[in-house]
Amino acid sequence: MLCLGLMSGTSADGVDAVLARFQGAPDRPEWQLLSHHHSPYPAALRDELVRIGQGEARPAAALLDLAEAVTEHQALAARGADPDQRASLIGCHGQTLWHRPPSSDKRGASWQLLLAPLLAQLLARPVVHDFRATDLALGGQGAPLVPRADAALIGPGDGWRGVLNLGGIANLTLIPPRWGPQKQESVLGWDCGPANSLIDLAMEQFSDGQQLFDRDGAMAAAGRCDDGMIQRWLREPYFQLSPPKSTGRECFGQEDLRRRLQELESVERADAVATLTGFTAAVVAQDLDRLRADRSIHLLELLVAGGGCRNPVLMSELQRRCRGLAVRASDQIGLAAEAREALVFALLAWWHHRGHPGNAPAITGATREACLGVRVAPA
């Protein structure tokens, strides 16, 4: 079956669209990535999404206009990846505006901006969307949804295999080995903390909006990392939580950056970016250290996807801090780093079509597994 996956993450840089073919057993399908297209958001649209994602209020009319603009851009990206309309089903994540994990006094909720009936009409094909809602209704975090899909797409290796996505947020998947005493362990996954979100915001601030990310890690490479401050930050509450846990720009956005820059006081801009880059790597390394200590899980390799894998300084920091671990881009095993998350939502749409569960209670904390998403057909 040909499916189209559409994904825009917390970085809000645009929409990734992939056309993929799936067949066979849902848990280990035969799959082929046929095309990938990235459609950047216009600057004004991206800026508005980032501001709202950090808590800025907007009138209802403005949110409606924004939903329409996001939906139309999803359709634009879809046409770029599938100009001949070969896909028979579309899986669309939408644009997260706010994610609220469950707490002791409030159920979890998550808002992905999308007018799904409009998208189905624009593309003249059924759309599966709202993938997080069912897991949240079952008491889960609603995130991350990628780990179960990672296990299906990548499969086990000779030892524990990690897949790290470095988008706005760093999220981690751990896939048990194909043999040995731990082969029956569950797939694990959680949101580690910020990946590119703070680095990107700092670059935009320092360049007066001229640079939206640290291209090739050039700014970080010119600076010096403050490891003392990083160790202090690692003691913050979120980084002490045990999985399941999830987060987003609502926690690691402009206000969080402002506080961290104040704590760094009068350091040079390059030093600040170097420290934020090292912080991203240190958050991941700390989680992996705890995993070894608490559960005797030792990764054999760490495959890195998302825009952050194109930052050589960040990759070098990961290699330095994750001692003894082979760190490499997911491209090296045939999984295109920038296409991975869109491919996941193509798979989730196919799973919905097959009636196959898409969440994993061990990862999200939901009371049970369930088929995810809501299907909308064109009129």
Curated annotation (Swiss-Prot):
Tree of life domain: Bacteria
Gene Ontology MF terms in the entry: ATP binding; kinase activity; phosphotransferase activity, alcohol group as acceptor
EC number, as in UniProt: 2.7.1.170
Pathway recorded for this protein: Amino-sugar metabolism; 1,6-anhydro-N-acetylmuramate degradation; Cell wall biogenesis; peptidoglycan recycling
UniProt enzyme class: transferase
Binding annotation for ATP: G9, T10, S11, A12, D13, G14, V15, D16
Classification via InterPro entries: Anhydro_N_Ac-Mur_kinase (IPR005338), ATPase_NBD (IPR043129)
Keywords: ATP-binding, Carbohydrate metabolism, Kinase, Nucleotide-binding, Transferase
ATP-binding keyword on record: yes
Residues making up the signal peptide according to the UniProt record: none
Keyword ATP-binding: yes
Catalytic activity, as annotated: 1,6-anhydro-N-acetyl-beta-muramate + ATP + H2O = N-acetyl-D-muramate 6-phosphate + ADP + H(+)
Gene Ontology biological process: 1,6-anhydro-N-acetyl-beta-muramic acid catabolic process; amino sugar metabolic process; peptidoglycan turnover
Pfam families reported in the protein's UniProt record: AnmK (PF03702)
Gene3D superfamilies: 3.30.420.40
Matches recorded under HAMAP family: AnhMurNAc_kinase
Protein family: Belongs to the anhydro-N-acetylmuramic acid kinase family.
Biological role: Catalyzes the specific phosphorylation of 1,6-anhydro-N-acetylmuramic acid (anhMurNAc) with the simultaneous cleavage of the 1,6-anhydro ring, generating MurNAc-6-P. Is required for the utilization of anhMurNAc either imported from the medium or derived from its own cell wall murein, and thus plays a role in cell wall recycling.
Protein name per UniProt: Anhydro-N-acetylmuramic acid kinase
Organism in which the protein naturally occurs: Parasynechococcus marenigrum (strain WH8102)
Gene designation per UniProt: anmK
